[in-house]
Amino acid sequence: MSDTLNRVAQVLEDRKGADADSSYVASLYHKGLNKILEKLGEESVETIIAAKDAQISGDCSDVIYETADLWFHSLVMLAQLGQHPQAVLDELDRRFGLSGHAEKASRPSA
């Protein structure tokens, strides 16, 4: 796993015990999963808008910035749920070399 992801994961774990007034991440943890999911939704919308703007302007700087926010808040969500980013990387690795259609067909139906 990337050193950056490891460092972020460690900081997110460390913030679980921090005072909510001293850390943005600690304040999210303190407010609970619903607040984290709300932020994740906001960042998703901002990323989509930035991508549409980038397609028109050719400037991807905002989409990179917003994607970083989206990934970050996804990592906060995973940490809140007791999951490490490595679990997502393992899932991506499992899918590597598997066609998207085959992967989708292998999922249990809802």
Curated annotation (Swiss-Prot):
Q: Which organism is it from?
A: Pseudomonas fluorescens (strain SBW25)
Q: List the top taxonomic levels of the source.
A: Bacteria, Pseudomonadati, Pseudomonadota, Gammaproteobacteria, Pseudomonadales
Query: Where is the protein found, in the record's own terms?
Result: Cytoplasm
Q: Which InterPro entries match?
A: HisE, PRib-ATP_PPHydrolase-like
Q: What is this protein called?
A: Phosphoribosyl-ATP pyrophosphatase
The cross-references to SUPFAM superfamilies, in alphabetical order and at most eight, read: all-alpha NTP pyrophosphatases (SSF101386)
Q: Which Gene3D superfamilies match?
A: MazG-like
Q: Which GO terms describe its molecular function?
A: ATP binding; phosphoribosyl-ATP diphosphatase activity
**Stored Pfam families:** PRA-PH
Q: Name one GO biological process term.
A: L-histidine biosynthetic process
Q: State the pathway, as annotated in the record.
A: Amino-acid biosynthesis; L-histidine biosynthesis; L-histidine from 5-phospho-alpha-D-ribose 1-diphosphate: step 2/9
The record lists the catalysed reaction(s) as: 1-(5-phospho-beta-D-ribosyl)-ATP + H2O = 1-(5-phospho-beta-D-ribosyl)-5'-AMP + diphosphate + H(+)
Q: Does the keyword Acyltransferase apply?
A: no
Assigned keywords, A-Z: Amino-acid biosynthesis, ATP-binding, Cytoplasm, Histidine biosynthesis, Hydrolase, Nucleotide-binding
What is this enzyme's EC?
3.6.1.31
By its UniProt entry, which HAMAP family does this protein fall under? HisE (MF_01020)
On whether Chloroplast is a keyword of this UniProt record, the answer is no
